[in-house]
């Protein structure tokens, strides 16, 4: 059995979801017999690093990030950032979402330290987090995406009216979102010019680049991809896609993570041909971005043709997340999924 450090928390807007992911990962690894060291990245950039490998996590308050951090620090002391440089882990299991946890920053840090980790490498993580760059790669690979524009803050400040007029050519409704972000945080469905101006100003308060994309009507599905090492070869498999029926206007943060926020159906209620096509495209997206270990790609099926919405390199791994749902539908246990992720991470570190 391995000594595994689990990174979770972080300073992104997805901190609370990462805590739930981290708790689920720690529980699962513990049942598998691994030595687990939960390492909490605090909202203000600190690290709470236990001195020993022992499973003591305040699961009972995992739904309250502030209380969770308080209880976690009671057990393990204050932030010990310096201890991360002498981390004695066989591998780091990444349970982070968004921001520096998913954009290649943490991955690069671990590369410098020479510590193997789960999931995609620096380049794939950075590209997938940048929605504009990812869409450009998808288009170059012959895949379909909704029409889009990227606007940077300086362009907006210098030519606000021109920017608004440009974005209006996408038509209404359209989706406005930060170029770098996840879990549909700060994603807005825009229906008119005034709302466009209002939400652009709001997003630019905390982000430097915005992408607006035409609204497509269709069936929303999401498909996970797992990598495995079998018979001396690396293999990629696509899981059964999940159909997303949002409780609101679209599959936003509330729909994803609040109880009753959306209705998720696995396998999706689509034709066999559509399912096969979605799975093929999910693997193609994974390959195009250079992902490793696992990924999850969201689609919208318009008149039988899937269009890519985005690819997540560190998809949610809470008890209600899509990857666990899809793995179960495929007859794959989460213990097997985690074993494969660990094996892929360790083997990749050798090259």
Swiss-Prot record:
Domain ATP-grasp: 135-343
Catalytic activity: 2 D-alanine + ATP = D-alanyl-D-alanine + ADP + phosphate + H(+)
GO CC terms of this entry: cytoplasm
GO process annotations (BP): cell wall organization; peptidoglycan biosynthetic process; regulation of cell shape
Involved pathway(s): Cell wall biogenesis; peptidoglycan biosynthesis
Binding site for Mg(2+) 1: 298, 310
Keyword DNA damage: no
Gene3D superfamilies: 3.40.50.20, ATP-grasp fold, A domain, ATP-grasp fold, B domain
Annotated EC: 6.3.2.4
Sequence similarity: Belongs to the D-alanine--D-alanine ligase family.
HAMAP family: Dala_Dala_lig
Official protein name in the record: D-alanine--D-alanine ligase
Source organism: Leptospira interrogans serogroup Icterohaemorrhagiae serovar Lai (strain 56601)
Lineage: Bacteria, Pseudomonadati, Spirochaetota, Spirochaetia, Leptospirales
Gene: ddl
């Amino acid at each position: 059995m391995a000594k595994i450090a689990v990174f979770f928390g972080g300073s992104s807007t997805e901190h609370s979801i990462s805590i739930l992911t981290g708790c689920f990962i720690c529980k699962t690894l513990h049942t598998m017999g691994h030595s687990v060291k939960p390492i909490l990245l605090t909202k203000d950039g600190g690290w709470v690093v236990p001195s020993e490998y022992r499973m003591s996590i305040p699961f009972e308050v995992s739904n309250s990030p502030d209380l969770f951090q308080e209880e976690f620090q009671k057990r393990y002391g204050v932030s010990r950032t310096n201890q991360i440089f002498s981390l004695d882990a066989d591998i780091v299991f990444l349970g982070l979402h968004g921001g520096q946890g998913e954009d290649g920053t943490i991955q690069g840090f671990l590369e410098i330290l020479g510590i193997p980790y789960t999931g995609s490498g620096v380049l794939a993580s950075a590209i997938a987090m940048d929605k504009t760059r990812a869409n450009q790669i998808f288009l170059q690979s012959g895949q379909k995406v909704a029409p889009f524009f990227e606007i940077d803050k300086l362009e907006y400040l210098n030519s606000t009216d021109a920017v608004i007029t440009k974005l209006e050519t996408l038509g209404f409704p359209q989706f406005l979102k930060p170029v770098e972000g996840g879990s549909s945080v700060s994603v807005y469905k825009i229906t008119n010019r005034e709302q466009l101006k209002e939400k652009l100003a709001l997003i630019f308060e905390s982000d430097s680049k915005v992408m607006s994309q035409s609204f497509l009507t269709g069936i929303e599905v999401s498909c996970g991809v797992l990598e495995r090492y079998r018979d001396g070869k690396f293999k990629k498999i696509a899981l059964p896609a999940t159909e997303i029926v949002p409780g609101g206007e679209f599959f936003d943060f509330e729909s994803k993570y609040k109880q009753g926020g959306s209705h998720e159906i696995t396998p999706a209620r689509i034709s066999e041909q559509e399912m096969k096509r979605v799975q093929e495209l999910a693997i193609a997206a994974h390959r195009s971005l250079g992902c490793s270990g696992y990924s999850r790609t969201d689609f919208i099926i318009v008149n039988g043709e899937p269009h890519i919405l985005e690819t997540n390199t560190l998809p949610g791994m809470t008890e209600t997340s899509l990857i666990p749902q899809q793995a179960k539908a495929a007859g794959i246990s989460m213990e097997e999924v985690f074993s494969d992720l660990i094996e892929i991470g360790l083997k990749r570190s050798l090259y």
